[in-house]
Structure formats: C-alpha cells, structure tokens
Amino acid sequence: MSCNGCRVLRKGCSETCILRPCLQWIESAESQGHATVFVAKFFGRAGLMSFISSVPELQRPALFQSLLFEACGRTVNPVNGAVGMLWTRNWHVCQAAVETVLRGGTLRPISDLLESPSLMISCDESSEIWHQDVSRNQTHHCRFSTSRSTTEMKDSLVNRKRLKSDSDLDLQVNHGLTLTAPAVPVPFLPPSSFCKVVKGDRPGSPSEESVTTSCWENGMRGDNKQKRNKGEKKLLNLFV
C-alpha cells in the first residue's frame, strides 16, 4: 500500500520509499498529504526528493519538518522566513502557520511582520556587525600587505648593499693589482733586417741613397716573396 505522500504526489511507492519515514511524526493521514503537497509546491517535487535522499534515513524526519517550517515561514514572511521570525520572537506565528497547513488551510504574507521595527533593528545590527567584520578583515589584509612590502623593501636594501660591497671589493682588488705591478716601458726592437748596418769601408760601397734603398729592400724581402705569389712586380734597385 502506498504512503500518503506518494499518493498525493501521484508517484509509485514501495517498501523502500524514502518519503514514508519523513511523515511518521504527523498523526493524521490527511495532514500528511497536506504537508507533502505544500512542501512539494514550495521546493518542487524533484527538489524535495533530492533533499530527502541526500541525508541519512534517521535524519529524514527532522529534515522534512525543517523544510515544512521554512516553507511556512517564507510564505508568511518572504523577507526573513522562519529564521527572521525566530530572531524577532515571532516563532509562534510560524507554528500557527504550520498548523494551518496541516489542517489544509491557506497562508498569506503578514504585513505587520514585514514592517516590524524590531526586525529592522535586528537587521541593522547584523549589517553593522558584518561591516565591522569586513573592515577588520581588510585591516588585517592591509597589515599583512604592509608587513610583506616592508620585508621586500628590506630584502632589496640588503641586496643593494651586498651588490655595492661586491663592486667596491672588485674595484679595490683591481686598483690594488694595477698599483702593485707598475707598468715598465718596453723599448721597441725592430727586426734584425732593419738593424743591419752597412759599413762604408767596403770597396765599391754605394752612396747613402744606395744604402737606404738596400736596407728597405732587405726589410721588404719577406713581403715581396708573398706578393710574388699574387702576381705583383718585384721592386727593382735602380741605384746599383
């Protein structure tokens, strides 16, 4: 035999029905049907079955009761629901709405609850507390950012000092090396071919111009051998 919930929802019921244990706390069969229809209209049939199947079997009756109170509270007070009525000490209104639903009655929003000054004060207080928490978190974040930036600045200063000390040490080492080994001028030594001296006591010695030409010829002898391979003409001595 199908349970009262599956009967009003027009769905098949079995021995493993997940809706049957949720309605055991309601005494009459008609009240079980009214509660099931009201919750299913508010949350949707698929949503109701999804909520019930997502919790263990022992917690399903309490879940269905919570859904029923929340649906009645949102219908009577759409702004704050059952939690708002509990906060403003109007829980008896929510209980009366549940009893009305179990009897098969209809609910409508109550304007007195929406314009309740105590509810507005409570909302303002909660908003103020939330703003204080947000500002506190922002201050904490700013402190963390400041400390982090200070640490980064200190690290950069240390790195700069380290680089400066390394550069100073490098300059000192290079400066010391240049001072400890002073440069000694080295005389220029021409090749041996240019250092050959032609004495003038040799018989048949040529004139000064001839000696200069012969020295230049001896100095360029190596270059002429390379140029000869390239097809250039040999320099002739016209004063011999």
From Swiss-Prot:
Extent of Polar residues compositional bias: 207-216
PROSITE patterns: LOB (PS50891)
Domain LOB: 1-107
InterPro entries from the UniProt entry: LOB (IPR004883)
Region feature Disordered, mapped onto this chain: 200-233
Tissue/organ expression: Expressed in young shoots, roots, stems, leaves and flowers.
Family of the protein in this entry: Belongs to the LOB domain-containing protein family.
Matches recorded under PANTHER family: LOB DOMAIN-CONTAINING PROTEIN 38, LOB DOMAIN-CONTAINING PROTEIN 39
Protein name: LOB domain-containing protein 39
Gene: LBD39
